[in-house]
């Protein structure tokens, strides 16, 4: 059953079910509880599952100010404290993985699982979109189209968001969490799709080097949602890891 709790004057939706040791599941940007429930449903026999809609997503209220990823982590910390969740296994997909990294860097956790979680900001290696824009600039008389191209090639996440959520998205993607990742001192499992364009496998390999006790599993022919595309296999992996 979905429950609403007020944290920092924001009504936040969450569900908690199952029994056993605690597992916390954190969804990605633009997603909600439903995106992590397939994992929770298959782990609930041996674990107490907690999943929330982050502020601004699902049925949780939108924040009135532009939060940072650290603000989101503080909200998670308050929620888990109220729910008496201690030393959980924390799992996050994409944006949720960013929050999991911060949480695990400064709280007691049993283990960490990250699914396609970009957390290392790179100045070099511009994205395909930026490369395309730069190539456009080389064509005479094309400069006027740059704004048009940026608008039409911009992130769907960004274009669909409210003004507050747009500012939050900018805050999130500009944050480099390398230093937080280095502080994670528990076994950490990275599960990635080899065709992930949002968080390329190269990023996962770097993350594996940064986190002291990390292991990487790359799933073939899989995208940013590799954990859902290979659910039976991922559940087997998780059961062995936990």
Q: How should these model regions be labeled?
A:
Residues 123-186:
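Conserved alpha/beta-hydrolase catalytic His-Asp/Glu region
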Residues 184, 190-192, 196:
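Short beta-strand/loop motif that positions the catalytic acidic residue
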Residues 197-203:
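Conserved alpha/beta-hydrolase "acid-adjacent" motif
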């Amino acid at each position: 059953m979905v429950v609403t709790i007020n944290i920092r004057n924001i009504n936040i939706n969450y569900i908690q079910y199952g029994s056993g040791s605690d597992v916390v599941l954190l969804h990605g940007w633009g997603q909600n509880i439903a995106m992590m429930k397939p994992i929770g449903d298959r782990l609930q026999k041996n674990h107490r599952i907690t999943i929330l809609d982050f502020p601004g997503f699902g049925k949780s209220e939108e924040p009135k100010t532009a939060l940072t990823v650290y603000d989101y982590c503080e909200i998670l910390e308050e929620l888990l404290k109220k729910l008496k969740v201690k030393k959980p296994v924390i799992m996050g997909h994409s944006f949720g993985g960013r929050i999991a990294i911060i949480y695990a860097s400064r709280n007691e956790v049993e283990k960490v699982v990250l699914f396609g979680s970009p957390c290392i900001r790179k100045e070099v290696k511009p994205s395909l979109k930026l490369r395309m824009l730069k190539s456009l600039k080389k064509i005479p008389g094309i400069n006027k189209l740059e704004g048009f191209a940026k608008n039409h090639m911009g992130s769907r996440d960004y274009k669909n968001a409210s003004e507050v959520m747009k500012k939050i998205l900018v805050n999130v993607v500009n944050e480099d969490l390398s230093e937080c990742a280095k502080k994670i001192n528990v076994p950490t499992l990275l599960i990635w799709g080899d065709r992930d364009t949002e968080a390329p496998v190269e990023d996962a390999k770097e993350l594996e080097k940064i986190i002291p006790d990390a292991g990487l599993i790359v799933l073939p022919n899989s995208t940013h949602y590799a954990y859902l595309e290979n659910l039976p296999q991922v559940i087997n992996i998780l059961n062995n890891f936990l």
